[in-house]
């Protein structure tokens, strides 16, 4: 599995430079499977905005940009520590036609966008240190970003989890899951944790099916839970 994981990292890395071309190409040329689009439209029809969520799975950049071709999209991004790499990736994302919102200062813009019925794409599967909420991932408590669930609860926007994985013929398979509807208040830690656990469960399900596609090099369980949660 490790060998296949590194092979997949190389293939996706090679496709990064082609991101704008892939996004603007006819869908059937890029995607062998495009499944669950009705879930995106159903979520948007609720009029509360949509949080499109994925993990570091397959070509997650292509997932966000392709959804941006389907409906107006902003991507909440964390700037890279390397300025040169950050500028290169930002240029690729801009050429793909999506709006970029930086994490931190961009949160207010994200809330405004969702409350206006807009769409937001983000990642939610890396170690969030002490700022995260602890939910189980492969049976172990993992510090998980609270942002997706918090935004959903604060605005009423459903979460639509999706993935963009390599197909056997070299193209990609995009799949969207039914919307996760927010239940509770953004100020309720229990509600944030419960919704985070729900979308993390979807991620785990996909990773179990396609383990080579997830970014295993990240130290997902780096932050230990506090004693009262362990």
Label the predicted regions.
Residues 46-105, 127-136, 140:
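Catalytic core of membrane glycerolipid acyltransferases/transacylases, capturing the structured
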Residues 7-10, 29-31, 54-60, 75-78, ...:
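Short, functional N-terminal and low-complexity linear motifs
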């Amino acid at each position: 599995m490790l060998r296949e994981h590194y092979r997949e990292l190389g293939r996706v890395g090679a496709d990064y430079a082609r991101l704008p071309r892939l996004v603007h190409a006819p869908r059937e040329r890029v995607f062998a499977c495009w499944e669950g689009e009705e879930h995106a439209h159903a979520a948007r029809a609720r009029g509360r905005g949509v949080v499109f969520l994925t993990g570091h799975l397959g070509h997650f950049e292509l997932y966000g940009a392709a959804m941006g071709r389907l409906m107006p999209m902003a991507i909440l991004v964390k700037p890279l520590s390397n300025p040169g790499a950050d500028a290169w990736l930002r240029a690729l994302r801009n050429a793909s036609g999506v709006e970029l919102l930086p994490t931190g200062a961009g949160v207010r813009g994200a809330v405004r966008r969702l409350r206006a019925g807009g769409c937001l794409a983000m990642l939610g599967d890396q170690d969030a240190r002490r700022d995260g909420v602890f939910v189980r991932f492969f049976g172990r408590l993992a510090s998980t970003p609270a942002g997706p669930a918090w935004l959903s609860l604060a605005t009423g926007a459903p979460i639509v989890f999706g993935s963009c994985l390599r197909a056997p013929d070299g193209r990609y398979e995009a799949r969207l899951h039914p919307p996760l509807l927010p239940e509770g208040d953004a100020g309720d830690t229990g509600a944030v944790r419960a919704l985070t656990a729900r979308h993390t469960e979807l991620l785990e399900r996909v990773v179990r099916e396609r383990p080579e596609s997830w970014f295993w090099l990240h130290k997902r369980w780096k932050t230990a839970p506090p004693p009262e949660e362990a």
